[in-house]
């Protein structure tokens, strides 16, 4: 009897280990679909989900996801719709991670959003970044270019922020670049107002929550006389009335520098020897589930009219033989690799060097 019990325990352990490996390959721990939620919250949501979907492992997995990310669904029809999207996202994660690519996907809070919803709430409309057609970055001594760079180690990169349900990525790329430049120049941290750019920079071919470009934002700040601090002009994530106040300015821009369209050698020179650079690229569906590794794709475009998301290049390096850009995103610190991702370098991947610029601060 004791011998049989040991065999059963070993078998159970093997099953558990297999489940854990499968969960790891999907980027989503489903070994116990309801384990990490509170009893009260789990019970309430489980009842809602079971009523709409039936008592299945997948339904409980979905309930756990919803509780973890604070989801609220209006009725049974919405539960069913979100569950269907979630299931498609889970399959995308698993199938991608089985391909042996240099990056991995994982389930995150975007897993129950359709691609159309995600585009509308997180990405901007394509912009014709004509400023980079003829760049004005002066190449610095290539002999001084470090093999790897991470400006976070220099203490000038500000914390990751979250743009919320507003296509204002361009404002966060802009403030991230300015915050780094200001701290580099003064030794002092600063948090700058994205909302001022959303509300006030429309005359410079920017469109608030519908998109814009850092190069155009730098021009606005230069001629406006400055950008207010975050404290004085806090973020709301919706288009509003401009209420910029000169007395609350946190930084002024003397000029901006543009990287020649597609010139990754210029971009590397700037990131390695100057400071973090605002960049933009084309987000395609799978990218929103990025978890770790060096992202690469054969399906994204590289032209100015392809790019739809602005971010901040804060370094570069090599991982498992693949050169990469280290990039700060604006989807919160719980997204990706603590709010960051790596993008393959050397192919102008997804247009990463197509619309790149950085400011010179006063």
UniProtKB/Swiss-Prot annotation:
Disulfide bond sites: 166-209, 200-242, 300-350
Propeptide: 25-144
The protein, known as: Oryzain gamma chain
GO CC annotations, alphabetized: extracellular space; lysosome
Chaperone found in the keyword field: no
Induction: By gibberellic acid (GA).
UniProt record similarity statement: Belongs to the peptidase C1 family.
């Amino acid at each position: 009897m004791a011998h049989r019990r040991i065999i059963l325990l070993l078998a159970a352990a093997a099953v558990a280990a297999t489940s854990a490996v499968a969960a790891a390959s999907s980027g989503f721990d489903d070994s116990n679909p309801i384990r990490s939620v509170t009893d009260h919250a789990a019970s309430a949501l489980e009842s809602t989900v079971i009523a709409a979907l039936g008592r299945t492992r997948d339904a409980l997995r979905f309930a756990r996801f919803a509780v973890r990310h604070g989801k609220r669904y209006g009725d049974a029809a919405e539960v069913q719709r979100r569950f269907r999207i979630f299931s498609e996202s889970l399959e995308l994660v698993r199938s991608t991670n089985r391909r042996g690519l240099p990056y991995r996907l994982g389930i995150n809070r975007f897993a129950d959003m359709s691609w159309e919803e995600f585009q509308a709430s997180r990405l901007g409309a394509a912009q014709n970044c004509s400023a980079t057609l003829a760049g004005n970055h002066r190449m610095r001594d290539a002999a001084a270019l470090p093999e790897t760079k991470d400006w976070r180690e220099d203490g000038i990169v500000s914390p990751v922020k979250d743009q919320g349900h507003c296509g204002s990525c361009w404002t966060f790329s802009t403030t991230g670049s300015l915050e780094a430049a200001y701290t580099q120049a003064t030794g002092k941290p600063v948090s700058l107002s994205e909302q001022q750019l959303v509300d006030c920079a429309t005359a410079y071919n920017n469109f608030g929550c519908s998109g814009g470009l850092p190069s155009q934002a730098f021009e606005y700040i230069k001629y406006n006389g400055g950008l207010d601090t975050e404290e004085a002009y806090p973020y709301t994530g919706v288009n509003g009335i401009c209420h910029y106040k000169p007395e609350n300015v946190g930084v002024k821009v003397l000029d901006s520098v543009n990287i020649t369209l597609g010139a990754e050698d210029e971009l590397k020179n700037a990131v390695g020897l100057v400071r973090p650079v605002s960049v933009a690229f084309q987000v395609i569906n799978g990218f929103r589930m990025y978890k770790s590794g060096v992202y690469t794709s054969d399906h994204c475009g590289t032209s100015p009219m392809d790019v739809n998301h602005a971010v901040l290049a804060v370094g570069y390096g090599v991982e498992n033989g693949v050169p990469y850009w280290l990039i700060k995103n604006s989807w919160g610190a719980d997204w990706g690799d603590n709010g960051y991702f790596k993008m393959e370098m050397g192919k102008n991947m997804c247009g990463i060097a197509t619309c790149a610029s950085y400011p010179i601060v006063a």
